[in-house]
């Protein structure tokens, strides 16, 4: 027996010794495979795959966020056809508050305990996270109430050593950023819902994909719901009554969101740390959700840390309603930061050369299927030979105009001197202008004398100095500005200014056009009264009638040249003006009226949306246009986005182009669709002498007078614009021409205020609002939301020229006498170089697409403190009754919409609302919330003086951002990271920062190729596919751009 034991011991000891070695050496076994570093942890059966992404940042895949035993799936690439996906089923828990979570991924600050992976760092920047990684093991400590059994990923960043904004360091190291976001979120174990906890003062969003968005501005204890299935109707949780739980400094909050029996439940609670059980009962709100064609598929939580320069998106998968293969492609697009998952999904199918019979094509839009053959044609095949040559010439000039051309383009910003121009480069400049003249359709270079090589060099370098921070994509577009080739470039702008102010009253009017529209008699009054009475009786008999913000340009919307028959597939639109509102309370009128709940305390979201629609059918709180942000041109499916930038040429007809754009946006908002109207018709039907039409200015009053007298406005295609023809006689009207004016009537404003009121026309001078600019801003926002745009009068002389940089935000003063008419088409928020939160107007000019930022520019709403006049001298809007038309009915939800798509400002506003200025305020009262989105004046004005001279530099701060994305499914986390050199890139539907390379060393090459070739592919239906086709290699993936 002893012998047996001895032999057994001799056998067991080596085995035990080998087991100990195996445990020690395989605790963290690192496997290198290409650019992927896989860290396999055998602690408790967890497998952490750390992928070095395109920026050199390690991302973790297959991190199991639970302490339960799990069957590990085999490692597969995202997008592989055999990736397994399962559906989680949910039941209602008996006690929701004590329910254990399956998944919790939280960032709770420095010093938090972690399990399996602990990452520490030194340093923090306002703009850029960049920390090194260390790996260790630790044991998770469960909390008390609502504690989880899950493994949690905690984050922390200290505040010292991250590179500053001006630092040359980037995120090209293998790093895992630590996120001091004080928001924790987790998926409820047996329920369709999440719990979000954190410190009061943060701003976050919860998205129940694809139907409901929840906004939480905890600093003001404001929680709002937006129902995406019902025209984006937004409701405040305090509709039912004031919240009992209020956030204060030092308090924490808890928000529980879950769905049961088609009812959305919200539970909100605030408490002092470690005193949650002692705090008051939670505020509870319930909302009934209508039966929807598509179920809820995931819950997303969006958070941001402005100091660390981090935005985080977590996607908790609760249901998969598409095949695993297709879901894997969509997940891959999500993890690479794509804002339009459908386009990325389509591009991936094309690049992978999937057959049309493939199951994933069921989830592709019908529009894409129709354009399949078009997509497979290279973008440049549509170019004429001169376009090829011009593109090549621009690239050559940009490669030679900088001294350090041998370095990467973005680093090389030193321009060569005039004496450095050699004979070959001079010829290149001359040839460039000849090509530009051939492809230019505005006729500008036909009118002006072309400059010599020295003139062109001076004009070009002046423009490049004004755009020193822009990338090659922007500069390629700027070099299509024809002004660069003019000998005396300052003459380019002289005839583009053409505004004269109207008189303030009929008695002071020296112009027939002024007095004509001031005439308002009892007959007009009675007609308007009858029309309004008729409209109010018949308006919106059908609840399905839709606002035209989402209306496509569709021939069925024509009034005169199309035969629309009401066969049950269309609704009537009865148009009337909707301007009679109290500027101080219109938001309250629209969104804060009492809402009835049923006996169980449940509010019906569908009924509420219909109620809002009936209150103001044209006032739509769209995700592309709301009180905080508005840019309908970003929504490529909208009617307004089809309105192109105009080029008035060498003629002072800015007043016509500003007026016609305003008229066209009103038509879009009223459901008439977009049909480009003829500016030349208005110009040539003016009663002024032909020789004066381009040289003497006018204003929107004359625009209305001409059309009201003629009762006709043809299409642009009927009577095309050429500024050289703006001296001809008023044309005779062929029967084949379309009349866009139709039955339009001018209405008279009945409210008394500080404005110039004319028939069909109202104007407000900012000087009257000097002590109450918030009222002015509210009024303008209202009009832009309601009518799509407003007309503005501004001063451009010695302020705005051909080289004006429209990319940034300018803080400029105005002048007593404006000289130019343009349009405000949107607005938004930004952070200036001093770290102050500010707001801007988005302005559309009529100086061509290649001027400013694709024809637009942004201006601070309030401007510098020392201004005598605001940059916006006057705002003008029309009051029109357009009559009635037929518009197609639209279903509440498209069956082929399967993928996430936010508006382009979604990430920026998330960051902005979490941003705390350096002169941060303490917790404000709830009454301060009303002014939270319009921010005051600062001393910052760059090169601005009281008269507003020569402003070129942007006052907007450049902020680098790291976007961390987490996809949580079956208790498994997959991560993606995208770095943006400027947070404004998150506003772009496409950006080369999202290119991907299997070889990390090839990332910069892929990004540079994308930037260089972008202008060739940007108008292609699938730019990612176009870039892939041009690249020909296999190292780059462009579908994520």
Swiss-Prot record:
Just prior to merozoite egress from host erythrocytes, proteolytically cleaved by SUB1 to generate the active 75kDa form. It comes from Plasmodium falciparum. Residues 101-173, 500-577 are annotated as: Disordered. It is found in: Parasitophorous vacuole lumen; Parasitophorous vacuole membrane. Residues 101-111, 150-168, 502-515, 564-574 have a biased composition (Low complexity). The lineage of its organism: Eukaryota, Sar, Alveolata, Apicomplexa, Aconoidasida. Belongs to the peptidase C1 family. It is a peripheral membrane protein. GO terms for biological process: proteolysis; symbiont-mediated perturbation of host actin cytoskeleton via filamentous actin depolymerization. GO terms for molecular function: cysteine-type peptidase activity. This is Serine-repeat antigen protein 6. The record marks 105-106, 380-381, 937-938 as: Cleavage. Pfam families: Peptidase_C1.
């Amino acid at each position: 027996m002893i012998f047996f034991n001895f032999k057994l011991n001799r056998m067991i000891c080596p085995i035990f010794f080998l087991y100990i070695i195996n445990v020690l050496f395989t605790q963290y076994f690192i496997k290198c495979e290409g650019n992927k570093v896989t860290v396999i942890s055998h602690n408790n059966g967890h497998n952490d795959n750390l992928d070095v992404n395109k920026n050199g940042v390690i991302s973790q895949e297959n991190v199991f966020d639970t302490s339960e035993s799990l069957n590990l799936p085999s490692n597969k690439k995202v997008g592989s056809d055999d990736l397994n996906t399962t559906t989680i089923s949910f039941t209602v828990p008996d006690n929701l508050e004590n329910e254990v979570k399956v998944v919790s991924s939280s960032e709770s600050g420095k010093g938090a305990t972690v399990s399996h992976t602990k990452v520490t760092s030194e340093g923090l920047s306002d703009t850029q996270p960049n920390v090194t990684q260390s790996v260790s093991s630790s044991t998770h400590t469960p909390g008390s109430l609502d504690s989880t059994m899950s493994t949690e990923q905690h984050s922390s960043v200290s505040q010292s050593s991250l590179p500053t904004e001006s630092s040359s360091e980037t995120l090209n190291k293998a790093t895992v950023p630590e996120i001091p976001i004080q928001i924790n979120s987790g998926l409820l174990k047996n329920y369709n819902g999440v719990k979000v906890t954190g410190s009061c003062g943060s701003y976050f969003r919860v998205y129940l994909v694809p139907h409901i968005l929840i906004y939480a501005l905890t600093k003001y204890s404001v929680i709002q719901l937006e129902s995406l299935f019902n025209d984006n109707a937004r409701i405040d949780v305090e509709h039912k009554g004031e919240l009992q739980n209020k956030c204060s400094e030092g308090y924490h909050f808890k928000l529980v969101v879950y769905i049961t029996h088609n009812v959305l439940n919200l539970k909100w609670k605030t408490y002092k740390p470690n005193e949650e059980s002692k705090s008051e009962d939670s505020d509870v709100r319930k909302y009934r959700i209508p039966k929807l064609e598509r179920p809820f598929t995931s819950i997303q939580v969006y958070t941001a840390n402005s100091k660390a320069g981090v935005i985080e998106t977590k996607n908790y998968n609760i249901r998969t309603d598409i095949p695993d293969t297709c879901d894997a492609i969509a997940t891959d697009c999500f993890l690479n930061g794509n804002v339009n998952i459908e386009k990325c999904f389509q591009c991936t199918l094309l690049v992978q050369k999937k057959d049309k019979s493939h199951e994933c094509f069921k989830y592709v839009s019908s529009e894409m299927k129709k354009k399949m053959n078009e997509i497979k044609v290279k973008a440049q095949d549509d170019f004429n030979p001169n376009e090829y040559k011009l593109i090549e010439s621009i690239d050559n000039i940009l490669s030679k105009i900088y001294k350090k051309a041998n370095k990467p383009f973005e680093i090389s910003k030193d321009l060569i001197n005039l004496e450095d121009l050699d004979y070959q480069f001079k010829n290149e400049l001359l040839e460039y202008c000849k090509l530009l003249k051939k492809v230019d359709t505005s006729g500008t270079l036909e009118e002006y004398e072309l400059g010599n090589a020295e003139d062109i060099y001076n004009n070009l370098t002046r423009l490049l100095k004004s755009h020193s921070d822009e990338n090659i994509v922007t500069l390629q577009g700027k070099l299509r500005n024809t002004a660069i080739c003019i000998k005396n470039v300052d003459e380019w702008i002289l005839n583009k200014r053409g505004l004269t102010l109207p008189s303030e009253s009929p008695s002071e009017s020296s112009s027939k056009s002024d007095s004509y529209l001031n005439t308002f008699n009892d007959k007009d009054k009675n007609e308007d009264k009858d029309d309004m009475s008729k409209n109010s009786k018949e308006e919106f008999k059908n609840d399905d009638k839709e606002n035209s913000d989402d209306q496509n340009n569709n021939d069925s919307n024509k009034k005169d040249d199309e035969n629309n028959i009401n066969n049950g597939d269309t609704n009537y639109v009865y148009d009337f003006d909707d301007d009679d509102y109290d500027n101080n309370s219109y938001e309250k009128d629209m969104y804060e009226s009492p809402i009835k709940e049923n006996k169980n305390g449940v509010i019906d979201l569908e009924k509420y949306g219909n109620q809002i629609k009936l209150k103001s059918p044209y006032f739509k709180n769209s995700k592309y246009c709301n009180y905080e942000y508005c840019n309908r041109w970003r929504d490529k499916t909208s009617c307004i986005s089809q309105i192109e930038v105009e080029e008035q040429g060498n003629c002072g007809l800015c007043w016509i182009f500003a007026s016609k754009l305003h008229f066209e946006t009103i038509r879009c908002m009223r459901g008439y669709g977009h049909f480009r109207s003829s500016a030349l018709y208005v110009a040539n039907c003016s009663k002024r002498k032909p020789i004066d039409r381009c040289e003497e200015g006018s204003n929107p009053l004359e625009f209305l007078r001409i059309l009201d007298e003629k009762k006709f406005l043809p299409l642009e295609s009927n009577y095309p614009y050429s500024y050289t023809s703006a001296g001809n006689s008023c044309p005779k009207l062929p029967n084949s021409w379309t009349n866009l004016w139709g039955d339009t009537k001018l209405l008279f404003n009945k409210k008394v205020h500080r404005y110039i009121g004319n028939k069909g026309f109202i104007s407000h001078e900012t000087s009257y609002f000097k002590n109450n600019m918030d009222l002015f801003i509210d009024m303008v926002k209202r009009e832009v939301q309601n009518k799509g745009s407003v007309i503005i009068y501004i001063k451009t002389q010695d302020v705005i020229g051909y080289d004006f940089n429209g990319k940034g935000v300018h803080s400029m003063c105005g002048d007593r006498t404006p000289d130019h008419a343009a349009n405000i088409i949107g607005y938004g928020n930004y952070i200036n170089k001093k770290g102050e939160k500010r707001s801007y107007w988005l302005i559309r000019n009529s100086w061509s697409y290649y001027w400013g930022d694709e024809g637009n520019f942004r201006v601070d709403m309030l401007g510098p403190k020392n201004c005598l006049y605001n940059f916006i001298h006057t705002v003008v809007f029309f009051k029109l009754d357009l009559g009635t038309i037929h518009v197609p009915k639209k279903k509440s939800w498209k069956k082929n919409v399967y993928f996430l798509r936010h508006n382009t400002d979604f990430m920026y506003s998330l960051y902005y609302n979490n941003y705390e200025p350096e002169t941060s305020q303490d917790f404000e009262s709830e009454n301060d919330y009303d002014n939270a989105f319009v921010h005051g004046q600062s001393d910052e004005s760059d090169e601005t003086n009281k008269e507003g001279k020569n402003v070129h530099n942007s006052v907007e701060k450049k902020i680098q951002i790291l976007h961390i994305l987490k996809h949580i499914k079956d208790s498994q986390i997959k991560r993606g990271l995208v770095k943006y050199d400027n947070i404004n890139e998150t506003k772009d539907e496409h950006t080369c920062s999202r290119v991907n390379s299997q070889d990390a060393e090839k990332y910069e090459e892929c990004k540079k190729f994308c930037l260089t070739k972008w202008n060739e592919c940007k108008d292609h239906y699938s730019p990612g596919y176009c870039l892939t086709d041009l690249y020909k290699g296999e190292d780059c993936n462009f579908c994520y751009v």
